[in-house]
């Protein structure tokens, strides 16, 4: 096992910085998605990018050579890990080369002539619905529906044109899709944030890297997990998540 680990580590090439001057970046959702905001903060607002419908589509884009990097949410300070993307990291031979943490500030968006009292149905991503559970619980009569992305929810409300519909998304989506902010900062935690990862198909790491994510399987027997985790202790490594 040690020989296999040593061989695997040698396959990764150390680099000084990521070269994304001519790179194509993919994010999930539509214009106004939080993934787009994370992408722009990491790569710059003028980066060459495109969007896809699902996180799996983003990983496929790297696999097929359509994109050099993908930006995916991996953990929220309120709702916890995004388990679907952990599964995708196992499924695809794509590797984490960076991260971007952004503040998540959810707003309730409706049509221009709508009032909060008109709302009967709310659309958003399931993670956002969880992050705004306290506000939504105070409106128990509202129906809640999850969609693939916050920006998708905002676009749907605009296109449907129903005064009783609202979306939970960033306030930026009100400007993009011609909606009105009915209420700002409706998330449970006012310091709500999400950690996004930047993944690529290349086995590289920068010399500033100080964190590693690994996935492994162990036998279903007594002490197996203990013996695996003991290597972290003996090598002076600190675990931040398991």
Walk through the language-model features, giving the residues of each.
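Domain-level signature for soluble enzymes in the chorismate/prephenate branch of the shikimate pathway
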Residues: 1-242
């Amino acid at each position: 096992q040690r020989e296999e680990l040593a061989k695997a580590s040698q396959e990764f090439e150390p680099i000084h910085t990521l070269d994304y001057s001519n790179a194509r970046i993919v994010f999930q959702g539509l214009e106004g998605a939080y993934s787009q905001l994370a992408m722009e903060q990491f790569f710059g607002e003028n980066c060459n990018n495109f969007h896809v419908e699902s996180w799996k589509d983003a990983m496929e884009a790297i696999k097929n050579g359509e994109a050099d990097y993908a930006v995916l949410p991996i953990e929220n300070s309120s709702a916890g890990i995004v388990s679907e993307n952990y599964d995708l990291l196992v499924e695809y031979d794509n590797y984490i080369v960076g991260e971007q943490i952004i503040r998540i500030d959810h707003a309730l968006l409706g049509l221009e002539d709508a009032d909060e009292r008109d709302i009967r149905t709310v659309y958003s991503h399931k993670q956002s619905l969880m992050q705004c559970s306290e506000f939504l619980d105070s409106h128990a009569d509202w129906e809640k529906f999850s969609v693939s992305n916050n920006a998708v929810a905002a676009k749907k409300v605009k296109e449907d044109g129903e005064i009783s519909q609202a979306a939970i998304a960033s306030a930026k989506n009100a400007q993009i899709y011609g909606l009105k902010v009915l209420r700002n900062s409706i998330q449970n935690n006012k310091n709500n944030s999400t950690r996004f990862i930047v993944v690529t198909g290349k086995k590289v790491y920068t010399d500033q890297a100080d964190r590693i994510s690994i996935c492994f399987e162990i036998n279903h027997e007594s002490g197996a997990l203990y013996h695996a985790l003991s290597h972290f202790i003996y090598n002076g490594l600190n675990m931040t998540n398991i």
